[in-house]
A protein has these predicted regions:
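Non-catalytic N-terminal regions of enzymes
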Residues: 1-157, 218-241, 345-406
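Helical lid/core segments from catalytic subdomains that handle acyl or acyl-like groups
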Residues: 45-47, 52, 261-337
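Low-complexity, serine/threonine/proline-enriched polar segments
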Residues: 155-165, 287, 333
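Flexible, P/S/T/G-rich "lid" or insertion loops adjacent to the active sites of thioester-utilizing
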Residues: 159-215
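Long, internal scaffold/assembly segments composed of regular secondary structure
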Residues: 190-283
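Short proline/glycine-enriched turn/loop segments at secondary-structure junctions
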Residues: 234, 254, 320-323, 357-358
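Active-site proximal loops enriched in glycine and acidic residues that flank catalytic Cys/His/Asp
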Residues: 247, 335, 381-385
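Short, charged/polar surface micro-motifs in flexible loops or helix N-caps
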Residues: 251, 337-340
Length: 406
């Protein structure tokens, strides 16, 4: 662990700190990601507490802090105090109950146990939180990889600056003039899950191919979500969607735990007039994806995030809100893919279900995660019920279900 105690945070980590700042304007819980694991049988709270407290690395990880010095790049440092990971039983008072970066909540029903792992997003991305679960379970052992880029960047400075400029121009070019966005003064977070069975999953994946998503099914999923939103929740709201979609920057085959956010982004401007049918929408989104990948846009955006690490949050905030005139995006969407292949048991018990729950949705009031576990697809939506009505959610579910499975 010692090697991680004075690492500069990554550019994507700094971006998560910015989102945390926005979220805390409306509610105290901040930028939290959650992983829900349901197992067959009972896991007792004290049994889990004993396992967690015996793992000194988890305590160190939970107690890390980020420095926030003006005009210097924030760093991960060891906290002055060591906080054991907080464990509690449902119902818990809030989505973040302790001083540390990790919390665990437990829920028992008659036959099964649900374990909810809550982690500050600056510490982990969706892959990272799954690996924290494996660390708790003992599937993997410390020491673990650093909390920032593991490979030294040898790209010349002038090339890094060129990439930064390219990314800046890309964001301004992609941002629509009349972006659809949701507005609400209050925040009441709710979660909605569309859980597809084996047959539905096969049908959806076949439909993705039929509609032209041969390079990436994510384009089809995003097209379907965008069309359903246009027809329901965003009906009459703006004329185009704008959103960043995370792209995993971890090295393929790297099964070790690397904390922090190893992400860049692809940016999509999706005019409503391109959302007339699934084939057209999928082709339009795929074309933007291919163009940006060929142009190395994710790499360029990584350098932009890296360059902006030294900025104080208020100035960083200004730069990122300027292209969108104050809004972050229309909605957030991530396709996190299949859960880790060895997530079949937890604490010696068979896993029934795993859910990568979306982070706090504010901003922009609505967030989607598409994922797959044990061969079946799930779409998880976290939304602000003060910005979106239950009637709109019901209509959205019907529209999306029809688009995906028709």
């Amino acid at each position: 662990m010692e090697a991680a105690l004075s690492h500069k945070i990554s550019g994507a980590d700094k971006f998560q700190l910015l989102l945390d700042r926005h979220i805390r304007l409306n509610q105290p819980t901040g930028n939290i990601i959650q992983l829900s694991i349901e197992v067959k049988g009972r896991i007792e709270l004290e049994e889990l507490r004993k396992v967690v407290n015996a793992n000194s690395f988890l305590t160190q990880l939970n107690s890390l802090q980020v420095t926030d010095n003006t005009l210097s790049i924030p760093r991960w440092i060891n906290g002055e105090e060591q906080y054991p990971v907080s464990l509690t039983e449902f119902p818990y008072k809030s989505a973040k109950v302790s001083e540390g970066l990790i919390d665990i909540a437990l829920f028992q029903d008659v036959t099964n146990t649900k374990v909810l792992i809550l982690v500050h997003h600056v510490l982990a991305d969706n892959m990272g939180i799954q690996q924290i679960a494996r660390l708790i379970d003992g599937t993997i052992k410390p020491p673990l990889l650093p909390l920032t880029e593991g490979v030294k960047d040898t790209t010349p400075l002038i090339q890094q600056l060129v990439h930064t400029l390219k990314a800046t121009l890309l964001v301004f070019r992609k941002t629509p003039k009349h972006m659809a966005k949701l507005v609400a003064a209050e925040v009441v977070t709710k979660t909605f899950i569309l859980d597809f069975d084996d047959k539905q999953t096969i049908l959806i994946e076949e439909n993705a191919a039929k509609n032209g998503a041969r390079l990436s099914r994510s384009a089809f999923y995003l097209a379907a979500v965008s069309m359903a939103l246009k027809q329901t929740i965003f009906a009459g709201n703006g004329d185009s969607f704008f959103l960043p979609v995370p792209q995993n920057q971890r090295l393929r085959g790297n099964d070790q735990l690397a904390m922090g956010n190893h992400l860049s982004f692809l940016f999509y401007n999706i005019p409503f007039n391109k959302l007339n049918n699934l084939s057209e929408a999928t082709a339009f989104i795929t074309a933007q994806m291919v163009e940006q990948i060929k142009d190395q846009s994710p790499k360029s955006y990584s350098y932009l995030l890296k360059t902006f690490r030294f900025l104080p949050l208020w100035l960083y905030d200004f730069f990122f809100k300027m292209p969108t005139k104050g809004a972050v995006c229309s909605f957030l969407f991530s396709d996190v893919g299949e859960t880790l292949p060895d997530m079949k048991t937890f604490m010696g018990k068979e896993i029934v279900e795993v859910l990568n729950l979306p982070p706090n949705p504010c901003p922009p009031h609505i967030t989607f995660v598409m994922m797959k576990h044990a061969g079946t697809l799930k779409l998880i939506m976290t939304y602000n019920s003060k910005a979106i009505s239950e009637d709109e959610i019901s209509k959205f579910e019907i529209a999306l279900d029809t688009l995906l499975i028709e």
